[in-house]
Amino acid sequence: MREGIEQAAADVIARERLTVTLAEQTLIVDEILNDMFGVGPIEPLLADERVTDILVNGPDQVYVERAGKLELTPLKFRDNAHVINVAQRIAAAVGRRVDESSPMVDARLADGSRVNVVLPPIAIRGASISIRKFAKRNITLARMAQQGNLSQAMVEVLKIASACRLNIVISGGTGSGKTTLLNALSHFIDSHERIVTIEDAAELQLQQPHVVSLETRPENSEGLGGVSQRDLVRNALRMRPDRIILGETRGPEAFDVLQAMNTGHDGSMTTIHANTPRDAITRLESMVMMANGNLPLVSIRRQIASAVHMILQIERMRDGVRRVTRVTEIAGMEGDVVITQDLFAFRYDASAFQEQVHGMFESSSLRPAFAQRAAYYGLEGALLGALQP
């Protein structure tokens, strides 16, 4: 195909007697191929491993995120119709439709990158394409520790938590690195376990051999055929999973996830949008109420306290670095309040305000609530040793 386009371009250049360098001719061919089979002018950004997000705001603005910071690129589309054409091709590749009657869609590229599209008139200044790139290199907690995302002691505690089959919720804001942390944490799951993953858009990269990946499906234009996360969680319980991993809990499926965690599916994991561990608990309460508004609040809190063992708070800080700022245990109930305790927290140095955030990951040195569980797995000594400052 490329050879044919190169020859056609050479013929046009010769016929029109144009002065074009070899580099310019190669660029023209690349642009044609990207328009025909790729994502137009932003195709080179998909190959750039430093880029984590690509944000198209109409034909004249293409931003990227590199090293946690947004940058405006010189890339442009020809016009708004060009942006829409690329967006529709992305949606069509996964069997979805985006047009004026259905102006918003979530999709993914062939490499797994997550895509959100919004078309006019909803997008007032031109079609919007937001791409969260799929990491090509599998990141581990050890590597995250080397990058300063968390400490080595935290890695050891999380390794023990996974071995002890703790149910873990990863909490953070948009773009904070929740899915990356979930992927890294999943490396500690035993290779002999059967894992069922549930996602709106497939992003998880589990390395174990026995993984069943399920993905939701939106309703068709007649409002039929939709498969929700709640449907998939309920079905997963019939699939004999050792662990259930839900890419993100965002609605009434929270009720079913807690039920699963409380009925023998220990070691399950999910993520949630929240700014603190306490906020994560409050959000879980609200989402359970979406499923069953008749449950008393204290009953919901008891379910959370018995189902969720640990909350990891991750944050993209002002220097662009994503850090696990809290490792928080749920230690039970006192009255009608869920009790938590921090095992680790990131303490930043407020006296040294610079572009780079300075601070350290500190252990609270508290005895973990899951120490007895760790003893059952023969890991209590290692756990207490990892928590020593």
Regions found by a protein language model. Name each.
Residues 170:
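Hydrophobic anchor at the beta1->P-loop junction of P-loop NTPases
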Residues 320-389:
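NTP-binding/hydrolysis catalytic cores, primarily Walker-type P-loop NTPases
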Residues 199-212, 236-335:
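Conserved P-loop NTPase nucleotide-binding/switch module
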Residues 16-21, 37-48, 90-107, 193, ...:
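Active-site phosphate-binding and catalytic loops of NTP-dependent enzymes
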Residues 135-146, 163, 183, 187-234, ...:
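P-loop NTPase switch/communication element
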Residues 1-71:
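N-terminal anchoring/assembly modules that precede and organize ATP-driven motor systems
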Residues 178:
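Conserved lysine of the Walker
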Residues 48, 61-164:
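P-loop NTP-binding catalytic core
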